[in-house]
A protein has these predicted regions:
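Residues on the lipid-exposed face of transmembrane beta-strands in outer-membrane beta-barrel proteins
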Residues: 148-154, 165, 278-282, 338-342, ...
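Membrane-embedded beta-barrel scaffold of Gram-negative outer-membrane proteins
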Residues: 283, 289-301, 305-308, 313, ...
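C-terminal beta-signal and adjacent terminal beta-strands/loops
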Residues: 461-464, 469-512, 526-530, 537-628
Length: 628
């Protein structure tokens, strides 16, 4: 088979409020050129001397000019205009030029596949962003995905095989930085050595990056870098901190220009993945079967890939934000399972299997510490995780009215990160720290899971239930009726305990650095259990001689016994409804400073009772299904 997929992702957003919103920008841009007084031309009126505003043409914004033109006022006039006093319908995006909208690194518009003024834009050459500075076009995200696959199922000597292979080609169709540490056009080490008339140390590659004493006019080399590994001037491994200290506070690569140009970018290298899929089974005996499968799967990066040139253009101003990384590769999963099925009796089957799943190239935050012109945080294919476990299933086929099924899973899930932002706290608190690489329990590491299902049903072809005779007619009132009971039991998932209560757990805008109690993800939530019950009955509706419809009436009880299951806790106390902050000395001091200590504590405790920390209570659903 063959598959081709190209999707176009466009978006346009105008930010109206806040410090970078359009309304605030209008206040800043209006009359900006009239902020000084013209002290060389005083206006004398009797005993009063007045100074008129000084018109500074080079300080006048494009927005101010367009606003005065639209009002019919002289562009170089001295009238003071208040945008807040005007009808909002008076304004339009066309009254702003690109520099006004970009606001020196705090853009009021975010766009992709549109013009900065909200009109749909055709695809252009990516370098147009740097060439057309009045429009700054940014293309829609248009990745291409091509796949070839083949699969065959056959039998050989009582062995059943299902073999397949899939070849994927993923192209993000995005320009990527030639080196993510350098947001500028730069020279490679061999070029730097040639320009300085020196020879590279033994072991230093010509395609490495040389760090020098002066970025544009170097006289000596201070160190080198290959990928994420740093070296001193002699080619010996060192750290980014050492290069920074030797460079006087900031590492300086040898640059072709100290401004961002298209020369700093290259095309995304398409990723080709070969994914074999193998499964087979064969009988061990007349009552037992062995089975196994091996799969390799890939998926496109989950997050952090769609970067725009504007992200790099203002990287100094936005270095505290997470900058997307367009060079991300697809994430890969390798899955292996082996097991056997055994028929214990004519009605009972046992299945036991063990599985191993490995996730590679998972996306995680990464700090490009020592980057130029500034260190920043982005994303890299760095995370990996393993999930291994054992499944045991017992299936009891229907005997009379009863059918049973029991399933148990023992699982161990470990990895370097549970989400793309798992490393944020460590990256932000340790200077020079790039990424967390230790194996820890993942957030979905649930050690034990048990599911039991019982289905009691009166069928027309089986046990019809009690009979009622009315005259010569025999009625089975329970025929077509049934009850299904599902029981779920599971051990708690891991979380990280803190040594101090955190007001950010309840309040907004407060997030102090906290200390971990023990190891990350070493604490566990409580076990949970819940019953779900479904009661239903089929009613046969005859439509003609040979046609009939079925009306199924059902009622479902979710969490039938209203179990109080804990899904989340506050990391200091380990409780779902008490963060521990209000009882702490800091919390008590905060409460004492309120107008009413009792009211503050009461409202704070109300907010602590986060319903998201608990499973849903008893819910009852009534429904109809009509089949014809």
């Amino acid at each position: 088979g063959f598959e081709f997929d190209q999707r176009y992702s466009r978006f346009y957003q105008v930010i109206l409020t806040g410090s970078g919103g359009l309304w605030n920008l209008m206040r800043l841009y209006a009359n900006r050129h009239l902020s000084e007084l013209n002290r060389n031309n005083p206006v004398v009126s009797g005993d009063t001397i007045r100074y008129l505003p000084l018109y500074q043409a080079d300080q006048q914004s494009y927005f101010d000019k367009k606003m005065r033109e639209k009002l019919g006022l002289p562009v170089d006039g001295l009238d003071f205009i208040s945008p807040d006093a005007m009808d909002p319908s008076f304004f339009s995006l066309e009254m702003f030029d690109i520099n006004d909208l970009y606001a020196a690194g705090n853009p009021a518009v975010v766009y992709q596949g549109y013009t900065p003024w909200g009109k749909r834009q055709r695809r252009v050459a990516p370098e147009k962003f740097f060439e057309d500075r009045e429009n700054r076009p940014q293309n829609a995200f248009a990745p291409t995905y091509i796949a070839l696959y083949a699969q065959d199922k056959f039998e050989f000597d009582k062995m059943f095989f299902n073999l397949g292979v899939r070849v994927d080609r993923f192209d993000a169709n995005l320009p990527v930085l030639k080196d993510p540490y350098i947001v500028r056009p730069f020279y490679r080490a061999e070029e730097t050595a040639r320009l300085l008339g020196i020879t590279l140390p033994q072991g230093v590659g010509g395609d490495w990056v040389a760090y020098v004493d002066n970025a544009l006019n170097p006289t000596r080399i201070i160190g080198y870098r290959q990928g994420n590994t740093w070296y001193d001037a002699n080619g010996a491994p060192t750290s980014a901190l050492s290069i920074i200290r030797a460079s006087g506070g900031r590492p300086r690569p040898h640059l072709k220009a100290d401004s961002l140009t298209f020369e700093a970018f290259e095309d995304y290298k398409p990723q080709i993945n070969i994914m074999p899929r193998i499964s087979f089974s064969f009988p061990i005996s007349d009552e037992a079967t062995f089975f196994a499968h091996y799969d390799v799967l890939t998926q496109r990066p989950r997050a952090g890939q769609v970067a725009q040139f504007v992200d790099y253009l203002f990287i100094v101003q936005n270095a505290t934000l997470d900058i997307p990384n367009p060079r991300l590769r697809p994430e890969k999963t390798i899955d292996f399972e082996v097991g056997f099925k055994q028929l214990l009796t004519s009605n009972i089957a046992l299945s036991i299997s063990g599985y191993y799943r490995e996730m590679r190239d998972m996306v995680q935050l990464f700090s490009f510490f020592g980057g130029y012109p500034v260190s920043y945080t982005s994303f890299e294919n760095l995370d990996f995780s393993t999930v291994k476990g054992l499944n045991v299933d017992i299936d009891i086929r229907r005997i009379g009215v009863l059918q049973l099924r029991f399933a148990y899973t023992l699982q161990y899930a470990q990895g370097t990160g549970s989400s793309v932002t798992s490393s944020r706290a460590l990256i932000g608190s340790i200077e020079g720290f790039n990424v967390f690489r230790s194996l820890l329990p993942l957030s979905f590491d649930q050690r034990h899971t048990f599911t039991g299902t019982a289905d009691i049903r009166f069928l027309e072809r089986g046990v019809k239930g009690p009979a009622i005779t009315i005259g010569e007619k025999v009625i089975y009132p329970l025929m077509g009726a049934g009850i299904n009971i599902t029981y779920n039991l599971g051990s708690g998932r891991p979380y990280t305990r803190y040594l101090l209560p955190n007001p950010a757990d309840v309040q907004f805008g407060v997030n102090p650095v906290n200390l971990i109690s023990g190891q990350p993800f070493s604490a566990r939530l409580p076990w949970y259990n819940r019953f779900d019950i479904r009661v239903d009955r089929d009613f046969i509706i005859q439509r003609g001689e040979n046609k009939q419809s079925i009306l199924n009436v059902y009622v479902i009880f979710l969490n039938a016994f209203n179990q109080r299951n804990v899904l989340g806790v506050y990391p200091y106390t380990g409780l779902p409804d008490d963060s521990g902050y209000i009882q702490s000395p800091v919390g008590q001091q905060l409460a004492q400073n309120q107008y009413s200590k009792e009211t503050f504590e009461y409202l704070y405790r109300l907010k602590e009772r986060n319903p998201g920390n608990f499973g849903a209570p008893l819910r009852i659903r009534l429904g109809l299904l009509f089949s014809f």
